[in-house]
Amino acid sequence: PMGAIGFIGISYLSFRAIQIIIEIYDGSIKSIKPLDMIYFILFFPSLSSGPIDRSRRFEEEINTAIPRQVYIDEYLLPGFKKIAMGLLYKFAIATVLHMFWVSKVKPDVGILPIINYMYAYTLYLFFDFAGYSYLAVGTSYIFGVHAPDNFDKPFLSKDMKEFWTRWHISLSRWFGDYLFSRFVLDSMRKKRFKKRA
């Protein structure tokens, strides 16, 4: 298990490092402050499972003085609320779902057991992962960093496209900004997609 956790942490570290390299390459990052970059890449609250922040936004925030009352109202109190929500999701709801639903599903081959397990595990995965994300974001707030939220009521989505934009938001936006959009723009410049006659 620790090996898997370590691998996940390395993957999120890689997302941050790749983002910096891409933005240096395309000129979005004009100057580099090594200590700020290292702090961004190794920022511990969100290191193991996100959310994936953006280096320029992160650097701007850590270098901006926060007035005491603003910190209390916009960072400290919201941070504790998010941590409380994370504890509720991860250690109460997810635990109950696993103990009394996921672990009780019989490993029978059949459509009903499969559907039952699918719903049980999906809900468990959401509350477990969203709970961790709330803990990470809340801790980030307390450290003076408005880390992005990772979930936005995904089960209220009208279709799979909307679901993808509400589930693990920071990861889907990362892929959109640093892989998909760049691939499309590069393909248009090189005319990879030719119009059919």
Regions found by a protein language model. Give the residues of each.
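Membrane-embedded transmembrane alpha-helical bundles that form the catalytic cores
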Residues: 1-197
